[in-house]
């Protein structure tokens, strides 16, 4: 069984780009460890091809080499926050909500057409950070779009923004999961890894 992690810096998380079996220091590492421990006899290959800074259009552009050619059994995708990020700051790229939806739909359509992979969608999220509060209305517009796409295309949907919103009040301080509100720290990465494991387990049990 081949599991492919796709996305941006949250998935990349400092991985070794010379070796796609290197999970980096983010949630793929924690998810892979949990899966290996739970299914020690299963033949499962983990590939991480997240690339820091990627937007939805950039993920689409590299689909053949980084998704289709690999023919994974499961593709998980966490993408979208950079489409919002790049609307702000000096070097703006004004990607509209409609363009993000079209990009994401094109990615999912191509996966369906050219692979037999199960699809797992992880929603983008924002955590407690004053500088990123201006992004919240834009993310709140995008999340229902991604949820609708997940209902149409995905086998598993992980609404991370909602999950974090419920979990954060139980933690000792607002930046428990992330210092900058976008990139998870070790606590945040381990938390996503556990959510990922719980969500993907039924797909694994049906295949191994």
Tell where the protein language model's regions lie, with residue ranges.
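Alpha-helical cap/lid subdomain in secreted, periplasmic
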Residues: 30-45, 58-208
